[in-house]
């Protein structure tokens, strides 16, 4: 999210901002800040397969180096962009346009990593159907991991090795493609311990979430195929494209100003700035010069040779 002027907030956010505040100089606990407008961020790239298994992913989380360390493949031809102004559907359409440009014959599998937002998933499926594109939606595995941590805090003492072991054991089972088993096991644990409805709420929420999205959580097949299972590229893009420039202390942006900055930073990070600048200067020349003449054809200039220079002869 980016802090913008009140007039540039979405209507729902403006309504929250209009609620009375207890203090004039700072927010109190629980009061909505209601100062930010959320950006939609997208990235399209190609990456070579990197076959892994659940155990190697868990080892990576534990920062355990493998016996034979190999260089991980890096994203290629990566293009990124973000928008505060345009609707979600427009950003998704641009994402599909770029994917089509990179793979016009659709020889490669198209994977779309999402963070669990239902509106985002619905919009992607709708656009894919309209374009006749076959895409595989994948839920960010790290996003699923956060639900396990929230549930684990209700079953294990916070900050203990038992909590970490409980979470990682179930995360490994998620990576093995056993989302339904994990959901059922968590609910049984809550029932056996006799937790109240309020105490077990995070457990039931996580279980319901996994069951509803188990079709997006075939991590065992994805790891075997060597495809990504997490949105690390998007997380990095959010930091470098948005936060490093727009989320600075004391900044409050206009919508048009923030959108312009996002476009320029996206061009730089995607390696397209030189092409854009050549196009920009050509259009500026046309607007300020060529368009002022009939038929937009400036008269040819008679080029003169260099003027003779005077020399002091002694």
Where do the PLM segments sit?
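Catalytic center-proximal scaffold of phosphoryl-transfer enzymes
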Residues: 1-314
């Amino acid at each position: 999210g980016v802090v913008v002027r009140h007039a540039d907030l979405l209507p729902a956010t403006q309504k929250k901002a209009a609620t009375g505040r207890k203090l004039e100089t700072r927010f109190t606990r629980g009061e909505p800040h209601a100062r930010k407008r959320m950006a939609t961020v997208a990235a399209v790239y190609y990456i070579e397969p990197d076959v892994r298994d659940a155990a190697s992913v868990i080892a990576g989380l534990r920062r355990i180096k493998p016996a034979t360390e190999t260089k991980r493949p890096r994203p290629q031809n990566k293009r990124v962009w973000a928008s505060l102004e345009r609707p979600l559907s427009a950003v998704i359409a641009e994402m599909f346009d770029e994917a089509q440009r990179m793979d016009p014959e659709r020889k490669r599998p198209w994977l779309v990593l999402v963070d669990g937002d239902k509106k985002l998933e619905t919009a992607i499926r709708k656009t894919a159907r309209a374009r006749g594109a076959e895409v595989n939606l994948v839920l960010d595995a790290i996003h699923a991991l956060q639900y396990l941590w929230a549930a684990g805090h209700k079953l294990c003492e916070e900050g203990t090795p038992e909590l970490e072991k409980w979470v990682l054991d179930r995360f490994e089972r998620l990576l093995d493609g056993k989302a339904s088993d994990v959901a059922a096991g968590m609910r049984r644990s809550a029932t056996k311990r006799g937790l109240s409805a309020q105490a077990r709420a995070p457990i039931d929420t996580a279980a319901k979430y996994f069951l509803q999205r188990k079709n997006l959580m075939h991590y065992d097949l994805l790891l075997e195929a060597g495809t990504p299972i997490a949105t690390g590229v998007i997380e990095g893009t959010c930091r470098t494209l948005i936060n490093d420039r727009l989320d600075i202390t004391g900044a409050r942006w206009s919508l048009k100003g923030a959108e312009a900055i996002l476009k320029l930073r996206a061009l730089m990070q995607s390696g397209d700035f030189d092409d854009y600048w050549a196009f920009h200067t050509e259009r500026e020349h046309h607007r300020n010069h060529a368009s002022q003449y009939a038929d937009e054809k400036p008269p040819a200039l008679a080029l003169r040779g260099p003027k003779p220079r005077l020399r002091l002869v002694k």
